[in-house]
Regions:
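A glycine-/polar-enriched beta->alpha junction
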Residues: 42-52, 59-74, 92, 100-117, ...
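Periplasmic alpha-helical coiled-coil/stalk elements that build and connect Gram-negative outer-membrane
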Residues: 2-3, 133-252, 348-351, 355
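N-terminal signal peptide c-region/cleavage motif recognized by signal peptidases
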Residues: 24-26
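Acidic, low-complexity, intrinsically disordered peripheral segments
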Residues: 3-6, 30, 41, 222, ...
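Bacterial Sec-pathway N-terminal export signals of envelope proteins
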Residues: 29-75, 80, 88, 105-106, ...
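Bacterial N-terminal signal peptides that target proteins for export
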Residues: 2-16
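Amphipathic alpha-helical coiled-coil segments
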Residues: 53-65, 133, 137-158, 167, ...
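Small/polar, glycine/serine/threonine/aspartate-rich low-complexity segments that form flexible
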Residues: 30-34, 77-111, 115, 230-243, ...
Length: 432
């Protein structure tokens, strides 16, 4: 029976050992790049391709502002005879025909300025979209850095417990050979170690996509390096931090959030578009001068040409109505956006207050005491002062408690990050 148990556990143990070895080798083989949050933000601003593309979009829209202000080019028209009864290209004063006209389109009702205003609105919208992209990607970067640190803390809990159990298992193997303990007790502890090692594999695997996203955001040329965040927050300060008034936070969010600004810019665009569509209903004037050598009633005729469309069949009423309805539509979108911003800020504040209540300084003291108690329990089991069942139960409870505390601490930090994100500026300093 004992041999059967050993055979059953041998294969999964060997498999897990291989997986752990490969993962550990992969993590250890990587160069470790310790990175402060300000350094990460600097590299992100300099190197991120999405931000670079958005900057070019702003420049492209600015070029259209200059283009919209330009006048239309003058038009040169000419009509010259090729052949008449006297021969080819006879353009002297006595025979032949030459006709030349130069005309210029003059846009009325301030169409050029109104079109330039629309181009300016598009540029402002591109800036708002850039700022919103920056806000979103920065939030993703900082969240990923804090999440990597969270996973590394979890890994540290497992590493510490696994290291202690490996020492214990090594000693128990010697005791088993001496016949001082049973195979069952030896296998129970090894099974506990096996489960912890298996859970550690999942923790290390969870870090890989986070690192990949951080590398993608930073684009700093260190794709093969393991980025280890260096964070400077003090948890007791975060637990006791006092938030600004809700209404103040909401007003700040409404004023500063780029997506809110973008909605207001789009409303401005629709208002300016209505003015432009009304201007399009006004006819433009084409003015020119012409010279006619022989075709007119008088030789060498010089005249003034004026033309304009008659505003009878098309007064641009459809586009004007479309612009009016677009204003109403965008106003509804803006009202909904403002309501959503207020709701998101309120939810972020509620989360912080909840996790500040859940986390407390007594928990930090309890965690430190629990670490000491784990060492005492390990020593007591080695000295046969507690049973195997008590030791295993305590080990599971110790691990679960440590992980729950870490999750609660990280939840508070994420809630604070979320508030900064929803307001659109750092109202709470987390990393010092």
């Amino acid at each position: 029976m004992n041999k059967y148990i050993r055979d059953k556990l041998r294969l999964p143990a060997i498999t897990l050992a291989v997986v752990l070895s490969l993962l550990s080798h992969s993590l250890c083989a990587q160069d470790t790049l310790s990175l402060l949050v300000p350094e990460a933000e600097k590299e992100f601003l300099q190197n991120n391709f999405s931000l670079l593309a958005a900057k070019y979009n702003i420049d492209a829209n600015r070029a259209l502002i200059k283009q919209a202000r330009l006048w239309d080019n003058p038009i040169l028209s000419t009509d010259q005879n090729i052949y008449d009864q006297q021969g080819f290209f006879k353009h002297n004063n006595n025979s032949g025909q030459v006709y030349v006209q130069v005309s210029q389109l003059i846009k009325t009702a301030g169409k050029r300025n109104k079109l330039a205003t629309l181009a300016q609105d598009n540029t402002t919208l591109a800036i708002d979209q850039f700022d919103d992209l920056l806000r979103t990607l920065r939030f993703s970067l900082i969240s990923d850095l804090f999440e990597v640190e969270h996973q590394l803390k979890i890994k540290k809990v497992y590493d510490s417990e696994i290291a202690q159990l490996e020492i214990l298992v090594k000693g128990m193997d010697a005791q088993l050979q001496a016949g001082n303990i049973s195979v069952k007790d030896n296998m129970r502890v090894k099974a506990l170690l096996f489960n912890l090692q298996n859970e550690l594999v999942n923790i290390e695997a969870a870090i890989i996509p986070l690192e990949s996203e951080i590398h993608l955001l930073l684009n700093n040329g260190h794709d093969s390096a393991f980025i280890k965040p260096v964070l400077g927050y003090h948890l007791p300060d975060l637990i006791n931090t006092t938030l600004p008034e809700r209404q103040q936070l909401i007003q700040q969010a409404l004023a500063t959030r780029p997506d809110g600004k973008a909605a207001r810019t789009q409303l401005d665009y629709q208002s300016h578009n209505l003015a432009y569509q009304k201007a399009l209903a006004k006819p433009d004037v084409n003015i020119g001068t012409e010279f006619d050598q022989h075709s007119s009633y008088s030789p060498n005729y010089i005249g003034l040409a004026v033309s304009l469309p008659l505003n009878i069949l098309n007064r641009n009423k459809g586009n004007i109505a479309n612009a009016q309805y677009s204003i109403r539509q965008q106003q509804a979108i803006l009202d909904g956006q403002n309501q959503r911003i207020s709701s998101e800020v309120n939810a972020a504040v509620d989360q912080i207050l909840f996790y500040q209540k859940v986390n407390n300084l007594q928990q930090l003291e309890f965690s430190q005491q629990y670490d000491t108690l784990f060492q005492n329990m390990l020593s007591s089991y080695q000295q046969r002062q507690v049973s195997l069942l008590e030791f295993i139960d305590f080990t599971d409870a110790y691990k679960d408690s440590k992980l729950k505390l870490l999750d609660q601490h990280t939840a508070l930090i994420k809630a604070l990050l979320e508030l900064n994100f929803q307001v659109g500026k750092d109202v709470i300093t987390i990393n010092k």
